[in-house]
């Protein structure tokens, strides 16, 4: 009876696969529309269905004859499914007609604005949920109630020195012709106002204020007018507040557009629930709590159009505009000086803060062998305006991945590990949706998450750009060799990527501008961020529309298809490879480059020697691991013992990144825990790695050389210990390093 049962199951599987293939073929014809239930398809009895029935009978007959044979093995490429099933090839084959499907999804998602926490956001959420369900995937939703920020009343005018009105200045966005969008504003900018002289501060960087000091110009009590390009806008506002400015106006470069954005400080997530999720009944800090007050800028700010900024700047007197500022202005102005005055700026702003409901949406594909290991793909769907680039180019790509995986599931494939597709909300306010979910599930994610693959602005121009933690570099390079370049016939993405940048260039993720931040900086999960095109002039403006994408960004939507293919193949490798495709020798090489760069900045070489010893050990551990994994792969892995050994190997790979976390976080910034790639406290820091060192340097800049050396040395020791922890985890053993070896390298205070 057991043999007969197996035979019947094999026959049923064969019939199910045949039905799924017929459904997939017809799905291509309708650009991805899923068919109805198999019973309804059989009721219509087209020729293909007759073939299915015949196939079922034949399979049943053969199975009864060969009862002694075992059922079909798992697919050769690693995922569960029919024998000889290649998930990567199948995924790529589903690109036929995908550009039309992606375009249709993007058009629907961008039909109107969908700012988080507003009624208009429901439409985009419904579209994503419907897409996940149409793919046949299990879905979940999770709601949070964070503090959100919206614009109230605002006004801007130019006054003569005697405070009589010279001109009302517009705070509207010229490109928002129908006034369908939320007016331009800075989220979390406090209410306030000023009647004061203006000073042009160029990009609003520290070096710009030093230039003004040399010219004898101060912004104390005045309105600082800046041009976008000086780093994070919140950092620009904070820098002006530190110089005692009364308010800040920031002009962008988009022709007719005004760039909205958040100015919240101190990292991502809901400011009232730092470290825990903003669920409906959660504890919330008071607004007068020190941890909350330092999250908000001290002075009001507002984005303005180039035309409005020009009207202010051209009235300025004072010292002449520095020559190197003239090329960076980027505005149609005839400027005589940097200010102050002689005219006055009358600026008022009223913020509307309130608790708002946001919703994260998930689709889950459970793994057959390691269901408790998660490969996570994420994109946010909320937008400041229409969001054709930011973020819904990525949303439409995520929906296409869901469609393809759904078809593959119906063909009998199942991933080895669980795949989770995530649609985040309220990213534009400071990565709130993703951060709250990570905080709520931190322990589970730290013990089970394999990697997080992020796509935000999937397409904003030509050429692939990527950032990742270093152990994923080689995986990304391998995958790009499998994907056709969308712009150059006969070339792969790898070919053009390599040529465009003069060699493969993968940046590190020491920034907090998208949803990888909580996964890497707080949870220590390997991350990657992908996008096509480097600069988009309509960023966060009314120009971020489907019309722009169709006319300029990706007219044929083939760059979208390329991103889908790269993103999806990365997920399949991480979900299906027997041994996780991580390379910690590459990680060690990158850390060595960081150590060398740090060495060029510091005089004391003993500190660098301390780092070098740990990095060398990590490299050795990575090589030892590769040899051990190769030996296991050459053996029979069908028995339970070998499967357990492989599981233990993968766990060491999975947990090594967590070793770079400092349990209590960076000094004074406890939410950020990653000692290699958290962002530095100073937004203008020249170090994009070793954030504790960067913080120690900036905080001790006014101290004695002895004190600065002590502060930096302490952070170097932390980093060295973390790297050593990672090496020990890769080896799967307790550390046996003699602490005296480190003590001998200490520097006398």
From Swiss-Prot:
The keyword Membrane is assigned to this record: yes
CDD domains: M28_PSMA_like
Origin organism lineage: Eukaryota, Viridiplantae, Streptophyta, Embryophyta, Tracheophyta
Summary of the tissues where the protein is detected: Expressed in developing embryos, roots, leaf blade, vegetative shoot apex, inflorescence apex and flowers.
Protein name (Swiss-Prot/TrEMBL): Probable glutamate carboxypeptidase PLA3
GO biological process, one term: proteolysis
Enzyme Commission numbers on file: 3.4.17.21
Coiled coil region boundaries: none
Known cofactor(s): Zn(2+)
Cofactor note (record): Binds 2 Zn(2+) ions per subunit.
Species whose genome carries this gene: Oryza sativa subsp. japonica (Rice)
PANTHER family recorded: GLUTAMATE CARBOXYPEPTIDASE AMP1-RELATED, N-ACETYLATED-ALPHA-LINKED ACIDIC DIPEPTIDASE
Family: Belongs to the peptidase M28 family. M28B subfamily.
Record topological domains on the Cytoplasmic side: 1-46
């Amino acid at each position: 009876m057991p043999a007969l049962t197996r035979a019947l199951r094999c026959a049923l599987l064969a019939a199910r696969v045949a039905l799924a293939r017929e459904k997939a073929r017809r799905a291509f014809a309708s650009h991805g529309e899923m068919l109805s239930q198999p019973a309804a398809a059989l009721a219509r009895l087209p020729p293909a269905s007759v073939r299915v029935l015949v196939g079922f009978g034949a399979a049943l007959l053969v199975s009864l004859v060969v009862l002694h044979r075992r059922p079909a093995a798992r697919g050769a490429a690693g995922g569960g499914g029919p024998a000889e099933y290649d998930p990567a090839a199948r995924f790529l084959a589903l690109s036929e007609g995908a550009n039309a499907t992606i375009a249709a999804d993007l058009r629907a998602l961008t039909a109107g604005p969908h700012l988080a926490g507003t009624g208009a956001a429901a439409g985009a959420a419904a579209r994503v949920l419907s897409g996940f369900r149409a793919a046949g995937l299990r879905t979940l939703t999770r709601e949070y109630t964070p503090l959100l920020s919206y614009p109230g009343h605002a006004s801007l005018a130019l006054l003569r020195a005697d405070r009589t009105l010279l001109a009302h200045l517009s705070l509207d966005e010229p490109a928002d012709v129908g006034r369908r969008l939320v007016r331009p504003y800075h989220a979390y900018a406090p209410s306030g106002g000023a009647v004061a002289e203006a000073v042009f501060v160029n990009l609003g960087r520290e070096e710009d204020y030093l230039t003004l000091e040399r010219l004898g110009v101060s912004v104390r009590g005045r309105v600082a007018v800046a041009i976008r390009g000086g780093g994070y806008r919140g950092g620009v506002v904070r820098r002006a507040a530190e110089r005692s400015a009364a308010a800040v106006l920031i002009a962008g470069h988009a022709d007719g557009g005004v760039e909205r954005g958040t100015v919240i400080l101190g990292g991502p997530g809901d400011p009232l629930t730092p470290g825990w999720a903003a669920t409906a009944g959660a504890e919330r800090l008071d607004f007068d709590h020190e941890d909350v007050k330092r999250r908000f800028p001290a002075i009001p700010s507002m984005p303005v159009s180039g035309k409005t900024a020009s009207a202010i700047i051209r009235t300025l007197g004072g010292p002449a505009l520095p020559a190197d500022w003239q090329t960076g202005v980027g505005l149609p102005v005839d400027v005589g000086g940097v200010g102050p005055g002689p005219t006055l700026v009358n600026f008022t702003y009223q913020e509307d803060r309130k608790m708002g409901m946001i919703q994260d949406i998930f689709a889950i594909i459970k793994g057959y062998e390691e269901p408790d290991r998660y490969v996570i793909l994420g994109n946010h769907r909320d937008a400041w305006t229409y969001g054709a680039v930011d973020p819904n180019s990525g949303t439409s790509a995520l929906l296409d991945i869901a469609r393809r995986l759904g078809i593959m599931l119906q063909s009998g494939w199942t991933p080895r590990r669980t795949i989770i597709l995530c649609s985040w909300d309220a990213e534009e306010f400071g990565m709130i949706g993703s951060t709250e979910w990570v905080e709520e599930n931190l322990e589970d994610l730290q013990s089970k998450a394999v990697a997080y693959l992020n796509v935000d602005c999937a397409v904003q121009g030509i050429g692939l750009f990527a950032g990742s933690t270093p152990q994923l570099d080689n995986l990304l390079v391998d995958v790009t060799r499998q994907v056709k370049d969308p712009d150059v016939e006969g070339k792969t993405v790898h070919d053009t990527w390599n040529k465009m940048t003069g060699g493969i260039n993968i940046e590190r993720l020491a920034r907090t501008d998208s949803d990888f931040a909580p996964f890497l900086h707080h949870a220590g999960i390997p991350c990657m961020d992908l996008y096509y095109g480097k600069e988009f002039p309509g960023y966060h403006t009314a120009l971020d529309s489907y019309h722009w994408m169709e006319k300029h960004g990706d007219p044929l939507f083939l760059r979208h298809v390329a991103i889908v293919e790269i993103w999806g193949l990365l997920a399949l490798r991480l979900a299906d490879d027997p041994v996780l495709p991580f390379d910690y020798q590459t990680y060690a090489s990158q850390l060595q480059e960081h150590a060398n760069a740090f060495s060029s900045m510091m005089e004391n070489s003993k500190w660098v020697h301390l780092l070098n010893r740990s990095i060398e050990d990590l490299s050795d551990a990575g090589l030892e691991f590769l040899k051990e994994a190769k030996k296991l792969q050459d053996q029979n892995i069908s028995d339970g013992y070998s499967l357990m050994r492989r599981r233990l190997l993968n766990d060491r790979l999975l947990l090594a990144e967590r070793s770079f976390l400092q349990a209590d976080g960076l000094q004074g910034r406890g939410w950020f825990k990653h000692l290699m790639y958290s962002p530095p406290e100073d937004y203008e820091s020249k170090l994009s790695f070793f954030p504790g060192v960067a913080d120690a340097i900036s905080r001790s800049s006014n101290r004695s050389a002895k004190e600065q050396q002590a502060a930096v040395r302490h952070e170097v020791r932390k980093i060295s210990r973390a790297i050593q922890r990672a090496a020990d985890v890769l080896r799967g053993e307790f550390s046996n390093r003699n602490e005296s070896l480190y003590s001998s390298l200490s520097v006398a205070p």
